[in-house]
UniProtKB/Swiss-Prot annotation:
It catalyses: FMNH2 + NAD(+) = FMN + NADH + 2 H(+). The lineage of its organism: Bacteria, Pseudomonadati, Pseudomonadota, Alphaproteobacteria, Hyphomicrobiales. SMART domains: Flavin_Reduct. Belongs to the non-flavoprotein flavin reductase family. RutF subfamily. One of its GO terms (biological process) is uracil catabolic process. HAMAP family: RutF (MF_00833). Keywords: Flavoprotein, FMN, NAD, Oxidoreductase. The keyword Amino-acid biosynthesis does not apply. This is FMN reductase (NADH) RutF 2. The gene is rutF2. Transmembrane segments: none annotated. Its EC number is 1.5.1.42. It is an enzyme of class 1 (oxidoreductase). Catalyzes the reduction of FMN to FMNH2 which is used to reduce pyrimidine by RutA via the Rut pathway. It comes from the Bacteria.
Length: 172
């Protein structure tokens, strides 16, 4: 069905359509006066490289949401194929207090938790926030990076985790 009437698109139809899209899987983490918290997210996007800026969308009903706002910092940890279980844990399978018990965590510039072995970690300061529907779009200035090479990226598509194998880039 093709429709241009926004009222004709139900929330369930929209969620079903979005489930068909493949997205990288991230653990978004924070720490500071509001406490340590984290969640799994696929709604992360580059905004600009000058200055380096990302956006992440967080549901205002999430138990972790107040900590992100109070702390004003976050780290977007992009997951590898080895982190599927961790992605499920941070998606709500385990309580907030137990989510950081597993792998090694470090810190970069902002103090937000950085997952050791993440494909890449974007250490950010929240510089703007926009309310849209049930979510906030957080605009985040990247203050530091950590990355590894050779790992396979974890994706989420069709309501299942998938792996995107790394390929060698071919020179000209």
């Amino acid at each position: 069905m093709i429709s241009s009437d926004p009222e004709a698109v139900s929330a369930s139809a929209y969620r079903e359509a979005m489930a068909q899209l493949a997205s990288a899987v991230h653990l978004v983490t924070t720490d500071g006066p509001g406490g340590r918290a984290g969640l799994t997210a696929t709604s992360v996007c580059s905004v600009s490289d000058g200055p380096p800026t990302l956006l992440v969308c967080l549901n205002r009903n999430s138990s972790a949401y107040p900590a992100f706002l109070r702390n004003g910092v976050l780290c977007i940890n992009t997951l590898t194929a080895a982190h599927e279980g961790l992605a499920t844990d941070f998606a709500g399978r385990v309580p907030q207090a137990e989510r950081f018990a597993g792998p090694d965590w470090g810190r970069l510039q902002t103090g937000a938790p950085v997952l050791a072995g993440a494909l890449v970690a974007f250490d950010c300061r929240i510089v703007d926030r926009h309310e849209v529907g049930t979510h906030d779009v957080l605009i985040c200035a990247v203050e530091a990076l950590a990355e590894i090479s050779g790992a396979e990226s974890l994706l989420y598509a069709g309501r299942h985790y998938r792996v995107l194998p790394r390929t060698e880039s071919k020179g000209d």
